[in-house]
């Protein structure tokens, strides 16, 4: 006979605990929510603050039904549209709301005044979410887009000279790369521009920032360029997953590690070659230009930090402009009326490549690009975390006019896609692509935020607009027409940026 030294649960008791676990979790969430509600109620009624409407969760405060809904929308390539539906489901004229996931409260807004407070007037009350910081550390080593405070100010100051008027207006450089792009487009054959544009923007970006292009569009470099693009794309997709599920940053990913090492080696080669070339002689191609790695080296930055900043800028410079070009041409291939108007606008040039100033004066082209960015902002969702107890200027109370109290540590999501599709701001046809609307509307600074706003506004926005407009003009000068090989509506694939879920498959037709 054995001697029992302690309690040994039988299978029945273990089963009871397993069955009780969901109930215990639910009770914990409810208790936490009730406690939080009492605290929030007391704090939110200070200084005239009132709570905003709450999203009508089907599973009360767990919020899992809506989370699964967003995941479904992402799989269906309609996630930016789902952001607007979040507000519409919460009531008429709701532009700021409370939202729960596992009992934890966050806020969403598409109100320009609230977005202005977060990005500008109360800039110091808000910081980057910890998930974003961790993601950039894991995937890119850190850098300007994953830091805030003094560290961000320092990175921003180093980067700003790269986007002077002289750098942006260098159409001689753009013309050369436009020729390389055109040489890769066969007449009358299907080509996926979504594959070519990242190569183009990588070539332009590296020459603008480093004084020398990596030559991605050169057939001799295609193998290296393809590997770089594949590695880059995997990193960006992983970053999207990490920001959605921060726990993933703790898990080992051998594929990610290999991609990061390859991109880091690539950046190291670019940095070392650029610094070595600049130290030997001042090449004519670099005269008057701010060569990014060289200037960082002059400031005494360690080589590793230079590589990190270079990779950050390569991500932004390649992907943002490539995504914008893809959006423009997905729609142009469906809109022969727009192509005709753009050809008419280009006709006075007589086939001569436009200058930067001439591109800026092309009114319909500018309106078309503005409308693309309104309907499909490249980054349709952003977020901040309250660095201190603060308030949003409005959105609270039954009429939505009272300020809203935000407790320190609370996350706020703001969607440029939901904002820029508001019918009260852009008309009943706000969901349609209509460039002509820009002949009569003049949205305020925070009613139209395709590149963000405030101190953290995208430093490369003018470069992206110039490149996208210039390359669009050059392709239109080279080809008489373009037809789409895609059927159905635009597929809003969203990772870090919005891209076309089915690529940009088109056929170009030469002028005869």
Curated annotation (Swiss-Prot):
Induction and repression of expression: Expression is induced on AF medium.
UniProt xrefs under InterPro entries: Cyt_P450 (IPR001128), Cyt_P450_CS (IPR017972), Cyt_P450_E_CYP52_fungi (IPR047146), Cyt_P450_E_grp-I (IPR002401), Cyt_P450_sf (IPR036396)
Subcellular location field: Membrane
Membrane topology: Single-pass membrane protein
Glycosylation sites: 272, 277
Cellular component terms per the entry's GO annotation: membrane
Record's catalysed reaction(s): ilicicolin A epoxide + NADPH + O2 + H(+) = 16-hydroxy-ilicicolin A epoxide + NADP(+) + H2O
Chief localisation class: membrane
Biotechnology: Ascofuranone is a specific inhibitor of trypanosome alternative oxidase (TAO), and quickly kills African trypanosomes in vitro and cures infected mice. As an essential factor for trypanosome survival, TAO is a promising drug target due to the absence of alternative oxidases in the mammalian host.
Superkingdom assignment: Eukaryota
Keywords recorded for this protein, A-Z: Glycoprotein, Heme, Iron, Membrane, Metal-binding, Monooxygenase, Oxidoreductase, Transmembrane, Transmembrane helix
Function: Cytochrome P450 monooxygenase; part of the asc-2 gene cluster that mediates the biosynthesis of ascofuranone, a strong inhibitor of cyanide-insensitive alternative oxidases and a promising drug candidate against African trypanosomiasis. The first step in the pathway is performed by the non-reducing polyketide synthase ascC that produces orsellinic acid by condensing acetyl-CoA with 3 malonyl-CoA units. Orsellinic acid is then prenylated by the prenyltransferase ascA to yield ilicicolinic acid B. Ilicicolinic acid B is further reduced to ilicicolin B by the reductase ascB.
Family: Belongs to the cytochrome P450 family.
Name this polypeptide is given: Cytochrome P450 monooxygenase ascH
